[in-house]
């Protein structure tokens, strides 16, 4: 079981978010660092993983409200499709 904490206070933009996820989850070098690429990676994820979301207000502030909302929706959508992922906030 893998555990990942996404702390909105530690991520200061979209690049930080995608760099963090790529490193923490061991994404391949061809990872596109955008929401479509993240969706593709997470829907095919095969390792039992729990992702904890903390400081969501800071995440929204740092990513921008619209991008943060899309990111959170993506995580919840992927959680429904992939039994290996659990999203907790």
Regions found by a protein language model. Give the residues of each.
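Positively charged, polar, low-complexity stretches
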Residues: 1-89
């Amino acid at each position: 079981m893998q555990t990942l904490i996404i702390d909105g206070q530690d991520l200061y933009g979209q690049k930080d978010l995608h760099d963090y996820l790529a490193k923490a989850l061991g994404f391949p070098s061809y990872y596109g660092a955008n929401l479509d690429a993240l969706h593709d990676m997470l829907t095919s994820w095969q390792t039992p993983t729990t992702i904890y979301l903390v400081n969501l207000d800071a995440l929204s502030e740092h990513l921008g409200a619209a991008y943060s909302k899309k990111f959170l929706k993506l995580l919840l959508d992927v959680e429904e499709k992939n039994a290996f992922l659990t999203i907790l906030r």
